[in-house]
Amino acid sequence: MYRPARVTSTSRFLNPYVVCFIVVAGVVILAVTIALLVYFLAFDQKSYFYRSSFQLLNVEYNSQLNSPATQEYRTLSGRIESLITKTFKESNLRNQFIRAHVAKLRQDGSGVRADVVMKFQFTRNNNGASMKSRIESVLRQMLNNSGNLEINPSTEITSLTDQAAANWLINECGAGPDLITLSEQRILGGTEAEEGSWPWQVSLRLNNAHHCGGSLINNMWILTAAHCFRSNSNPRDWIATSGISTTFPKLRMRVRNILIHNNYKSATHENDIALVRLENSVTFTKDIHSVCLPAATQNIPPGSTAYVTGWGAQEYAGHTVPELRQGQVRIISNDVCNAPHSYNGAILSGMLCAGVPQGGVDACQGDSGGPLVQEDSRRLWFIVGIVSWGDQCGLPDKPGVYTRVTAYLDWIRQQTGI
């Protein structure tokens, strides 16, 4: 019987160093491949902005929709933003959709038209026409399921450059840097402000030296404190500057007129409010634009967060600082502020207190006239106070005292026509 010859096999072993090298090389190649894949899927993305104009067929326009400060404006804008957000978060674009913001409500016949800016993130190699088509498809679903908001179904979207999107958003008052970029992240933090963090803040300079703060409330008017002009109210001696640095400002503005409240009383700090009219209108940018005036009925509850900004001294009798600083404080009720151990009845109805119980965070010399602001649910900023007076700076139970802006809205409108 035929039997194949037995072949003697020789065992061969790879060098352990070679094995180790192959394993390590394989792991490295795999790691690099995964890293590149993660990068291109998660990080190699670009932001894209789109604008859509929604015609609301069953909402009648009225004067309360003129200002983002009114509850009616906030409610309607919030409903539209929530509807858009919910629609995209439940769609196949849930991971690409970032945020939507109503930039403006305006009259359209007897109805309302809402101009909305939306932000998405797609990988860079996505086709623009394809992205737009996908977004429009989702919006059409929304228009068919818009609840009790009747929206014209012929709505279309327009692609915007980053600058064009910013231009839409800065024309609305109170837009901070996170709103202008439609970012989901807050930029606040620390005590030294970043450029553009508080774009309405101005420095009022007497004979070219920083003297007081102020706030742009439109492109022609600055809101500030009356006591800033006790020594000199000649407009020719004043200029206003924008930017976080008083040494290297971004913009210089000449002053045409200074309007001080007729009933300002320096002894009691009553009616400590003034307006500065500029010689020329300001062209708004992402770093320079106005803060919102509040509605007369705006709620400013005790304990709520507010921010005060300025170039004032960091301690009582200290020197002003060249870079803008910010401080987080809490609103304090007038009853608490009027307690015997605090201001013992000196806080009047046209005043507002803010600080921290233990002291340490406060406005100080050089901050006078600057803004105390709060952010609403739509991330718009409103000026609720004007730095007015206080007992030294940052003492416990001696918070900063501010002019209550809601008490002077009629006066502001009479002077400015805003």
From Swiss-Prot:
Location of the Peptidase S1 domain: 187-417
Tissue specificity annotation: Located in the cells of the submucosal serous glands of the bronchi and trachea.
Localization annotation: Cell membrane
Record-given protein name: Transmembrane protease serine 11D
Keyword annotations of the record: Cell membrane, Disulfide bond, Glycoprotein, Hydrolase, Membrane, Protease, Secreted, Serine protease, Signal-anchor, Transmembrane, Transmembrane helix, Zymogen
Occurrences of domain SEA (ranges): 46-163
GO BP: proteolysis; respiratory gaseous exchange by respiratory system
Classification of source organism: Eukaryota, Metazoa, Chordata, Craniata, Vertebrata
Disulfide bridge map: 173-292, 212-228, 337-353, 364-393
